[in-house]
Regions:
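Loop-centered beta-sheet repeat module
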Residues: 1-19
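Conserved strand-turn element in the central/C-terminal portion of the radical SAM core barrel
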Residues: 1-7, 26-30, 40-51
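Short, basic-rich loop-to-helix N-cap that marks the start of a DNA-contacting helix
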Residues: 133-138
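Residue-level signature of tetratricopeptide-repeat
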Residues: 129-130
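Short alpha-helical segments in extracytoplasmic peptidoglycan/chitin-binding modules
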Residues: 112, 125-126
Length: 158
């Protein structure tokens, strides 16, 4: 059975060595194959967890392709797998408290992209808004709800 570290390693190879633009994943769906297939024999996973694995792989892919995160920055558990209960970006943030808080009014794009809840589009909005002056409130750049609360854990308005 593949571990996430192997999948991430191969994905990085596809991007770096073969210049792939995109990698796609598909969760194995039990009951569609012969009983000798390893996926059919794995009884411990529920359909929800199987699809969450796929979702986490897409999150890692996006972090690598769009955020410029390196494969070494993807945090895996002791057995070489992704944590299914938390977002990979948030796990990185929890393991690197020295990086936070990020100063919204001073940080570069790369640092802004390390803040859980901020993506490339929001980072661009922040950088463009700063041209006209200091951002006073995160709500002023369109953040609200759960995303706003998440950003507030890792960023300050200095």
């Amino acid at each position: 059975m593949f571990r996430y570290f192997e999948i991430v390693k191969y994905m990085l190879g596809l991007y770096k060595k073969l210049n792939f633009q995109r990698v796609y994943f598909s969760a194995y769906q039990k009951g569609l194959g012969h009983c000798s297939i390893p996926g059919e024999q794995n009884r411990e996973s529920t359909p929800e967890r199987i699809f969450m694995r796929e979702h986490r792989l897409y999150q890692v892919d996006y972090l690598i392709r769009k955020y410029g995160v390196s494969g070494d920055d993807i945090i895996l558990d002791k057995s070489g797998n992704l944590e299914l209960d938390s977002d990979p970006k948030e796990i990185w943030a929890e393991h690197h408290p020295e990086f936070y808080p990020v100063r919204i009014n001073k940080a570069g794009k790369e640092a802004l992209l390390r803040v859980p809840g901020l993506g490339p589009a929001t980072a661009d909005i922040i950088l463009k808004s700063r041209i006209y002056g200091k951002i006073k409130r995160l709500e002023d750049i369109g953040l609200k709800g759960k995303r706003l609360e998440n950003v507030k854990k890792y960023a300050i308005m200095e």
